């Protein structure tokens, strides 16, 4: 059975992910260390983990498997869940796979090195746009269909027709 895990701290697409999860009838876990509104739908569960570095990431990484989808911008978390067989969609609609996660990790490390070399560099990433939101919805829809098919294959087809 497919589950949808959301690395919910600072995730701009929680509502969109919930709509897709409900439409597909899959459980969705909003994982954070607090500060998010409890979900209204019974398929959506808030998981509050203790404060600390990467605690939410570890909770997700310990559970995500083949047939699951994870929404995160955290590249190290994405690498862990991709290795476990889960599909990853970033909030901007980019998908991370075994084919591109190595490049994503290398780029992340390079950018961290560049930022540390210039402590006076200001500014962050670009603002989150309607186009990003639209790309996310398209990518999540494709990932959910692919994950549900992978979940059926992994379980020997026992979920067919559900």
UniProtKB/Swiss-Prot annotation:
InterPro entries according to UniProt: UPF0178
Origin: domain of life: Bacteria
Pfam families: DUF188 (PF02639)
Family to which this protein belongs: Belongs to the UPF0178 family.
Protein name as catalogued: UPF0178 protein Rsph17029_2512
Originating species: Cereibacter sphaeroides (strain ATCC 17029 / ATH 2.4.9)
Lineage: Bacteria, Pseudomonadati, Pseudomonadota, Alphaproteobacteria, Rhodobacterales
């Amino acid at each position: 059975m497919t589950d949808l895990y959301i690395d919910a701290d600072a995730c701009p697409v929680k509502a969109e992910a919930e709509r897709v999860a409900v439409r597909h009838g899959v459980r969705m876990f909003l994982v954070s260390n607090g500060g998010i509104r409890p979900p209204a739908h019974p398929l959506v569960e808030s998981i509050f983990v203790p404060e600390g570095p990467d605690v939410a990431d570890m909770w997700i990484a310990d559970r995500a498997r083949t047939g699951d989808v994870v929404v995160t911008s955290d590249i190290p978390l994405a690498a862990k869940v991709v290795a476990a067989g889960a599909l990853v969609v970033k909030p901007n609609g980019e998908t991370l796979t075994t084919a591109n996660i190595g490049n994503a990790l290398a780029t992340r490390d390079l950018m961290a090195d560049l930022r540390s070399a210039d402590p006076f560099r200001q500014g962050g990433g670009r603002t989150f746009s309607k186009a990003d939101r639209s790309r996310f919805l398209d990518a999540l829809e494709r990932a959910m269909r692919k994950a549900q098919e992978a979940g059926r294959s992994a379980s020997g087809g026992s979920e067919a027709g559900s």
